[in-house]
């Protein structure tokens, strides 16, 4: 079992392979009360952190996803992290990845083309090219999560254990209510 982090960073940057679950991870951070922005260019992270009021003592946290497929954006990300550290804002990079087979299957199931696939290029070739482009970011990441065999609930638990200020009891949300079978089972009921 993962241990709860002693330090919750002010800013979490979520990046990684296309199709590895960045959007799902962003939903988890949103549920934990983070201010979330999807596909933010790295050079805007420090400015956004100041606008949102990160590091002002109000206990607010920021999560952003960054799409780093273009080589210049990796350098921008490192510059952004350095700028945050200069402003005494803590920052963690979470890198999500999955095996080639799983990524190919996910793109096939969704009937989507890989975002960096060139005309006539196979999904497998595009994935390999993207993996090479992102190797430097992966090496710099504070947390690497392989989502190949993870269900969304397991990803949620990993991220909550690492980045939530709430205790396990506060993370569990239980609603008890009564109903009549005459009107059918409540649609929002998970367990009866």
Where are these regions (language model features)?
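Short, hydrophobic/glycine-enriched beta-strand segments
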Residues: 10-17, 174-178
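Conserved C-terminal guanine-recognition region of P-loop GTPase G domains, centered on the G4
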Residues: 77-87, 99-101
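Conserved nucleotide-sensing/catalytic segment adjacent to the nucleotide-binding pocket
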Residues: 30-82
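Conserved nucleotide-binding/hydrolysis micro-motifs of P-loop NTPases
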Residues: 69-72, 98-103, 150-152, 180-184
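C-terminal accessory "lid"/substrate-recognition subdomains
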Residues: 1-3, 125-191
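A glycine- and Lys/Arg-enriched "phosphate-lid" helix/loop adjacent to the NTP-binding pocket
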Residues: 89-134, 143-150
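Glycine-rich phosphate-binding P-loop
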Residues: 13-29
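Pre-Walker A (Motif I) flank of P-loop NTPase domains
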Residues: 7-12, 59-62
């Amino acid at each position: 079992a993962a241990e709860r982090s002693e330090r919750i960073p002010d800013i979490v940057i979520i990046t990684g392979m296309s199709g590895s679950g960045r959007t799902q991870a962003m939903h988890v951070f949103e549920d934990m009360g983070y201010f979330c922005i999807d596909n933010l260019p790295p050079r805007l992270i420090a400015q956004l952190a100041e606008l949102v009021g990160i590091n002002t003592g109000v206990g607010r946290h920021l999560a952003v996803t960054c799409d780093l497929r273009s080589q210049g954006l990796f350098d921008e990300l490192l510059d952004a992290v350095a700028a945050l550290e200069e402003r005494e804002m803590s920052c963690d990079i979470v890198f999500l990845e999955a095996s080639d087979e799983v990524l190919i299957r996910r793109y096939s199931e969704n009937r989507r083309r890989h975002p960096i696939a060139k005309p006539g290029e196979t999904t497998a070739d595009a994935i390999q090219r993207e993996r090479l482009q992102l190797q430097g970011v992966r090496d710099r990441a504070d947390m690497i999560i392989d989502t190949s065999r993870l269900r969304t609930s397991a990803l949620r638990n990993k991220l909550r254990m690492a980045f939530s200020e709430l205790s396990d009891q506060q993370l569990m949300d239980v609603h008890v209510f009564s109903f009549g079978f005459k009107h059918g089972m409540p649609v929002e009921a998970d367990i009866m």
